[in-house]
């Protein structure tokens, strides 16, 4: 019995590990490679007829005057893939609302590199095909796009060990890339336009905009309008990918507001005190109100898109029958080499060189920690076109035509070349230029110094937790109650250190006030007191708090603007920059920056893992 139980437990653990891996970007990329190989093997096996017959199977419905019939291949490309492009639109809206595109310098750099990363590959393709005097110029759109998910997954496999900042840069870049690529699909590769369905589609977009203006927080009205938009777009003759992108752009996104979180907490307290169906529904609605409908839809669609929709698309589009001399024919075709050169060389030079020149000219700035080698490595990986490329090939040539099959071979070969080139550039950058990471620093610098740092708990405690705080930050541990949970769990086993990272309007003066209180031995009472009064942090409020706590007010006022206190706060600011802390709260467990969630349960689990010596988060050596 024990052996059997152990076997079942081991199998369960293996399944859980596989499921966890598939949820990562690298896992999704590996799944896509596997599905692509399956499609190629199936299309070249004795069962190849079944493969092609499956995707040409007619599927449709009649509902009163509405009639929609397409083969299965079109249902995938014009139906399922709309969700993929809708997801891209959601991400673009998030980046503009509270992401990296709010930074004008980064947005300008992404726009410049994104545009040239679309234009140059297209020019390379046209040049090669035109010089060869070959047909196939209409397929230039196959080289303009980047498969964001595939590219980021490949980056996780072949890129630097820590590449968070490079990932942000590439994601910002592909936002522009994807927007332009989808616009090209909608404008260049659409069929004959029908006016009435087009007007209905435009009215649907206006409806989405109006819903956003009214701050509608429920997802259902948006989803219903998007469904109408899709139907109208399919009937209009415009490719549905453009509708998906446009719809995603119109779904409102905004940063989570503190008052929404507080309201949800009160609703949960009501449920805790009097559990009922009504109070449970109120909690559910309260939680939904606290997060933008954009982020909720994105979270709901992200995994199904990565693990189901895109793999199905790959299965439907990557199956090329290379028997009968197709490979020899493809490698002798200007279309194949136009696709390869456009995606591999065009993306590398269009993104890499343009980024370098733009930075040198002061037109933009790279994220901290990202070097030139990392930029070119990421530019090389941007040559993984796959999803957008295969979609445009189907629209331009048809997947079963000779030109379509040759272009598809070019896309698949370019994926291999782009991956190998990116891997090589990352290796050279690490060995020659020391670019072993492309991320913010991960190690606390300088280490905790009991003579300088503010420490709560025994100085020789087994565990150390450092938090960078801003007294106006609504999510720091003392503001949310996380610290109380941590102290209750670890007691004297935990040494807690606070450093300043003021970035809110009242943050600097509040930080100086805490140091003025520290000069009178009252740092921790001050911190506990002021974090409950974040709504009132003007100078006169802080002086009033000093009086309430029994401090020497005259000395407090003198210290508030003293050079020594200012220098003490600036020391912590310099430490934050050197340690990769750029927002509050930022936690360091045993001198290593914590990434991801920072709720009390997560921080407790990481501290316990450190105590057991099983923490796996990577840190540069």
Swiss-Prot record:
GO terms for cellular component: plasma membrane. In the N-terminal section; belongs to the NhaA Na(+)/H(+) (TC 2.A.33) antiporter family. Its main location: membrane. This is Na(+)/H(+) antiporter NhaA. Na(+)/H(+) antiporter that extrudes sodium in exchange for external protons. GO terms for biological process: regulation of pH. It is a multi-pass membrane protein. It comes from Herminiimonas arsenicoxydans. The keyword Ion transport applies. It catalyses: Na(+)(in) + 2 H(+)(out) = Na(+)(out) + 2 H(+)(in). The lineage of its organism: Bacteria, Pseudomonadati, Pseudomonadota, Betaproteobacteria, Burkholderiales. The gene is nhaA. It is found in: Cell inner membrane.
């Amino acid at each position: 019995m024990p052996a059997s139980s152990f076997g079942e437990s081991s199998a369960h653990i293996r399944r859980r590990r596989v499921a966890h891996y598939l949820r990562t970007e690298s896992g999704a990329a590996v799944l896509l490679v596997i599905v692509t190989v399956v499609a190629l093997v199936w299309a070249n096996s004795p069962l190849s007829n079944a493969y092609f017959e499956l995707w040409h199977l007619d599927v449709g419905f009649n509902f009163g005057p509405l009639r929609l019939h397409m083969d299965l291949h079109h249902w995938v490309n014009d139906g399922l893939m709309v969700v993929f492009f809708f997801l891209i639109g959601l991400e673009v809206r998030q980046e503009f609302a509270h992401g990296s595109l709010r930074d004008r310098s980064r947005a300008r750099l992404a726009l410049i590199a994104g545009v040239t990363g679309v234009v140059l590959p297209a020019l390379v393709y046209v040049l090669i095909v035109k010089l060869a005097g070959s047909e196939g110029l209409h397929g230039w759109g196959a080289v303009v796009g980047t498969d964001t998910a595939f590219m980021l997954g490949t980056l996780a496999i072949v890129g630097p060990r820590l590449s968070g900042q490079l990932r942000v840069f590439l994601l910002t870049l592909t936002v522009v890339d994807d927007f332009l690529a989808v616009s090209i699909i909608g404008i260049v590769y659409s069929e004959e336009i029908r006016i009435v369905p087009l007007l209905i589609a435009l009215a649907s977009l206006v409806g989405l905009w109006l819903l956003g203006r009214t701050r509608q927080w429920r997802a259902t009205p948006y989803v219903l309008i998007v469904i109408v938009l899709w139907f109208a777009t399919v009937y209009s003759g415009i490719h549905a990918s453009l509708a998906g992108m446009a719809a995603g752009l119109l779904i409102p996104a905004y940063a989570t507001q503190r008052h929404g979180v507080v309201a949800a907490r009160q609703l949960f307290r009501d449920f805790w005190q009097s559990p009922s169906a009504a109070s449970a529904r109120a909690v559910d609605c309260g939680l939904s109100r606290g997060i933008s409908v954009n982020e909720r839809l994105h979270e709901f669609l992200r995994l199904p898109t990565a693990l189901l929709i895109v793999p199905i698309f790959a299965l439907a589009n990557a199956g090329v029958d290379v028997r009968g001399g197709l490979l020899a024919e493809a490698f002798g075709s200007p279309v194949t080499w136009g696709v390869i050169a456009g995606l591999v060389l065009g993306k590398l030079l269009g993104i890499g060189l343009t980024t370098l020149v733009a930075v040198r000219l002061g037109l933009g700035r790279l994220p901290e920690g990202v070097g030139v080698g990392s930029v070119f490595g990421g530019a090389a990986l941007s040559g993984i076109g796959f999803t957008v490329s295969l979609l445009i090939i189907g629209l331009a040539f048809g997947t079963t035509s000779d030109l379509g099959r040759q272009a598809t071979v070019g896309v698949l070969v370019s994926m291999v070349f782009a991956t190998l080139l990116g891997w090589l550039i990352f290796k050279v950058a690490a060995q020659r230029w020391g670019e072993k990471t492309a991320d913010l620093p991960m190690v606390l610098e300088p280490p905790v110094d009991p003579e300088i740092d503010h420490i709560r708990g025994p100085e020789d405690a087994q565990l150390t937790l450092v938090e960078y705080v801003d007294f106006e930050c609504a999510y720091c541990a003392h503001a949310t109650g996380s610290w109380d949970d941590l102290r209750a769990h670890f007691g004297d086993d935990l040494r807690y250190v606070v450093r300043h990272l003021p970035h809110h309007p009242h943050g600097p003066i509040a930080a100086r006030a805490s140091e003025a209180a520290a000069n009178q031995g009252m740092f921790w009472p001050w911190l506990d007191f002021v974090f409950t009064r974040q709504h009132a942090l003007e100078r006169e409020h802080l002086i009033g708090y000093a009086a309430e706590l029994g401090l020497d007010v005259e000395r407090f006022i003198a210290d508030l603007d003293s050079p020594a206190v200012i220098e003490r706060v600036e020391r912590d600011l310099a430490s934050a920059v050197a340690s990769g802390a750029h927002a509050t709260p930022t936690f360091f467990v045993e001198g290593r920056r914590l990434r991801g969630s920072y709720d009390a349960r997560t921080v407790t689990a990481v501290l316990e893992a450190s105590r057991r010596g099983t923490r796996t988060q990577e840190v540069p050596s």
